[in-house]
Amino acid sequence: MIGHLRGIIVEKQPPYLLLEVAGVGYEITAPLSTFYHLPEPQEEILLYTHLIVREDAHTLYGFHNDHERRLFRALIKVNGVGPKLALAILSGIGPDEFVHCVLNQNIDQLVRIPGVGRKTAERLVIETKDGLSRWHTNDTPSPEGLRSSNTQPTQDAISALMALGYKPQEAKRAIDAIQKPDLSAETLIRLALKQMVLGT
């Protein structure tokens, strides 16, 4: 098992990034909560990782801290929740907000995440509440000021939302509603998700 990787970011486009470690490029899938903390390409970063091995693929998932990784591991143990949905949850409302929803049994907010129906939301609360009640974190994502090296942040943001399960029209409408110029892709994604999932 690969516990963590320290290397140089070669490129990043949510939800994927390429990390070079000792001359080897690792393709890593990460939630948007992790992307909010990533530095610019060519800078060094430490990512906590989780490797999932299947017959047709070896997929490496990366996280900003161990709290995110532990939450991811707890999510994929829930019946009906796979890695893709776990990433959508972490990307949609973030680790701290998810813990808050579970501890307060806020089913209505959980079902606003693409792929999470009422039954799944109820299972998430039932199966993770005891474990999450012992978790605490003050590590809140703060994407403001982060810049994307991509020259098409709007298109990148729309693509990332589609990768999370939103329809193209929904993704475009959410991004278009953010009438603020010169924002990075990461900031556009965060603001769009805040509007769609949290309703603010």
From Swiss-Prot:
For this record, an example GO cellular component is:
Holliday junction helicase complex
User: Which key words are in the record?
Assistant: Cytoplasm, DNA damage, DNA recombination, DNA repair, DNA-binding
Gene Ontology molecular function terms on file: ATP binding; four-way junction DNA binding; four-way junction helicase activity
Q: Name one Pfam family in it.
A: RuvA_C
Task: From the Swiss-Prot or TrEMBL record, state where the protein is found.
Answer: Cytoplasm
Domain of life from the UniProt record: Bacteria
The cross-references to CDD domains, in alphabetical order and at most eight, read: UBA_RuvA_C (cd14332)
The protein's assembly and partners? Homotetramer. Forms an RuvA(8)-RuvB(12)-Holliday junction (HJ) complex. HJ DNA is sandwiched between 2 RuvA tetramers; dsDNA enters through RuvA and exits via RuvB. An RuvB hexamer assembles on each DNA strand where it exits the tetramer. Each RuvB hexamer is contacted by two RuvA subunits (via domain III) on 2 adjacent RuvB subunits; this complex drives branch migration. In the full resolvosome a probable DNA-RuvA(4)-RuvB(12)-RuvC(2) complex forms which resolves the HJ.
Q: What's the name of the protein?
A: Holliday junction branch migration complex subunit RuvA
The gene is ruvA
